[in-house]
């Protein structure tokens, strides 16, 4: 999937719509109020990635050479026996490790959204 597709499907996983042209996330909060989050990009923003993981109840496991992300709850299309992972070089810089974590969170969220 392209980065745009990852963002579109990740937004869908949290019942929102991602506007590719403007980089805005549109949706409704739990009280039914409409909102628009300017510059939503969990591929680049730690806070956006964290909120995405929190909304979907994703677990993040860091190891010396990889990052594993799986779901606490069952989601259609996600095999609970097969967590998603991405390789991180041993002793890699924090900025690279953060990039790998964000990208893996978005990949899992996008897969959830794609299966909805």
Residue ranges of model-derived segments:
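Glycine-rich anion-binding surface patch
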Residues: 1-116
């Amino acid at each position: 999937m392209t980065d745009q597709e990852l963002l579109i499907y990740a937004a869908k996983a949290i019942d929102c719509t991602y506007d590719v042209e403007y980089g805005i996330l549109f949706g409704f909060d739990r009280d039914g109020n409409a909102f628009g989050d300017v510059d939503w990009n969990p591929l680049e923003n730690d806070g956006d990635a964290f909120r995405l993981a929190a909304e979907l109840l994703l677990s993040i496991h860091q190891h010396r050479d990889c990052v594993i992300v799986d779901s606490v709850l069952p989601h259609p299309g996600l095999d609970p026996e097969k967590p998603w992972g991405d390789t991180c070089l041993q002793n890699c810089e924090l900025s690279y490790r953060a990039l790998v974590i964000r990208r893996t969170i978005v990949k899992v969220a996008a897969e959830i959204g794609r299966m909805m």
